[in-house]
Structure formats: structure tokens, C-alpha cells
Amino acid sequence: MFSFVLVFIVPLSNLLSNEFYKGDALVKEGVYAFYNYDFDKAVQVLDEARGIYPEHPGVHFIWAAARWVRAQANSPVDETYKILENDLQTILPIYDALVLKFDYDPMYKLYRGSAVGLTARVSLGKKQWLRTLYRAYKGFVIINDVAIDYPDLADSQLPIGIVEYYSAISNRLLKFAAGFYDLNPSKDSGLQKISVSADRGTWSWIESKAILSNLYLWVEDEPILAVDYTKSLVQNFPNNFYFNLLYLEDDATAFSSLLASSNI
């Protein structure tokens, strides 16, 4: 549901209980409200966090994404893109400045790439196809550079894993394009990278687990592997209807698989 930009962004996620960046706890509160479908509270909390902790690496991007999703629930489609476009125009100069100030910290570059990539969604909404491709490419290059330079940064593995997985099941042109960026167009490699993000990502574990749940349930036909991921999502976000529905589907399908394999 919330993987609205897939390749182009580092999705929203949980922050660890021990703050690494000042403001982690407040941003976490906003993120949890977001994934529990309390969008008004999420935007309110993230507004506050932006004011108090303007140098937090994720708060500006998460704020823009939360405002866009809230708009999708309450506003006409054209208005949602105007909101997203205006918010991105607001935060991109902020990220440009933060990357310069904290050039030693890859998280700022990662979120800058995410914000640049999200501009592709605005172009897509306007049916500007070439601009969509260009902006998506521009954002992905930034994210891919971070993943290459900082291979231990688990959060960067999600978008790379998505590209590798989907290029493996797509046409030759997409496979060639993935190889051009030194990516491995392989389902196994893609799943492994997404799993790293799900298990170790500070920011990306929520979307990573949701994506793995869908892939194992509907594409890989391995529902048993999906259950643990969806169970974790439901435990953390009990008010998220989509996660609850996904968990029920995973659990029921996994149970049916077990019965079938046992010849019961």
C-alpha cells in the first residue's frame, strides 16, 4: 500500500529506541501514527519534529510523504500532486544544504536521492513520461552511489533489491539496464537485499517486510516465509487494515500449504 515509489525512495520506517540522531523518538512517533492510519497526527507530529530538529536526515522527506498520503485520502487527485510538488520544492533545497554540511554521513545523501526520485511521481501524475524517467533515473543514481560507497548501510539495500528482483522477471531491456549499473538482475539477489533491509534496516524495515510478504505470498508461492514478516507488521501497527489483511491471507495460505504437504 505505502510502497508508492518503490525503487525511488527509502520508505518510511521505525527508528531505534536509542536515538542515533536528535529527534529520532519524535520522528518515530510520527511514523508509527502514519502506519497506524492516523495521518492527521502523523503530519502534526512531523511538523513539530521539522521545527525542533531541522537537521534530522529523514524528517523532511517523511513529512512530505505523510502529507501526500493524507492528501490522497481527502483531496482530488490533481490537488494531491500539487501538494507533493510544493512540498518537494520546499525540502529539496534543505537536503542540498544538509548534504553539504554533513558530507560524511550517507543518510543525508540517501534521503536527498529519495526526495529527487519522488519528484518522478509528480511527473508520472502529469503523464510527463520522459521527465518521469529522467527524474527516476536521477534519484536512483544517487541512491545506488550510496549503496556502492556504503555497502553496510542496510537501508540502501531495499531500492537496489527491488530493481534486481523486478529486472530478473522482466524483459531483456530492463535486465540490460540493471547490468549497466553493475546490479545483479537476479531474484535471489534481490530477495537477499530486501531481506537485509527488513532485518537490519533502521529506516526501511516496514516497507521491506511488506514487500517481502507480497512477493512470497503472490509471486514466489512461499506463504510460510511471508507469515513472520506480516506478523511483525501487525504487532507493531495493529490499526493498519492492509497489514492485518495481508497477515490473514499469509496465515491462511500458509496453513493450506502445510495441510497439502502433509496430505491431510
Regions found by a protein language model. Name each.
Residues I52-G58, A66-V69:
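Glycine- and aromatic-enriched membrane insertion/assembly motifs of diderm outer-membrane
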